[in-house]
Amino acid sequence: MIKNKFLIYYFLCSFLLSCSISNPLKTNSKISSKDCPRSLILYESRSLELGNAKLELPTDYLLNCYLIEDKGIVEISIDYSLNVLLKEQEENEYLSNFIVFVTDETKQITIDEYKYLKELKIENNDRKFFVFKFNDKIQIDLNTYNSGVRLFFAIN
């Protein structure tokens, strides 16, 4: 009988303590949507000839911008695709860099440059056209972002 009372008391105390103590590791970040800056694919760097294949950066990319208030940064999420048009299928893998240039509003000063190496693996089949979808993120200081930035995209 005493064992049962002790077990009931133990479980009741454990339950009450676990419900009343907040998680000390829990962090709340306030994130809000932000207007995205102007962006453009650089004309000369929108496609790339790789011998038996042509890589192309289509213009149907999508930007989503978020302000992370407690860190004072703006995160820009870039959804884009790379198209591969095969002339002949000799290779199964192609490498390309997706490059993002961040400039000031006047396009005179390059603030930052981000490079993302992309590995495009082709499966053996009869198709000649492949679409690879990607998502990359960049982070810009809020003060820099508020002073005005532009984004330029390229592949090489």
Label the predicted regions.
Residues 54, 63-77, 86-92, 140-144:
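Short, solvent-exposed beta-strand/turn "edge" segments of beta-rich domains on protein surfaces
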Residues 94-108, 151-155:
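Extended low-complexity, serine/threonine- and proline-enriched intrinsically disordered segments
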Residues 38-71:
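Post-signal-peptide N-terminal segment of Sec-exported extracytoplasmic proteins
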Residues 1-20:
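Sec-dependent bacterial lipoprotein signal peptides
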Residues 23, 147-148:
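Eukaryotic non-globular, compositionally biased segments
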Residues 18-35:
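Bacterial Sec signal peptide processing site at the extreme N-terminus
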Residues 114-147:
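Short, solvent-exposed, Trp/other aromatic-anchored flexible loops in extracytoplasmic proteins
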Residues 75-81, 152:
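One-face residue pattern on beta-strands with alternating periodicity enriched for small/polar residues
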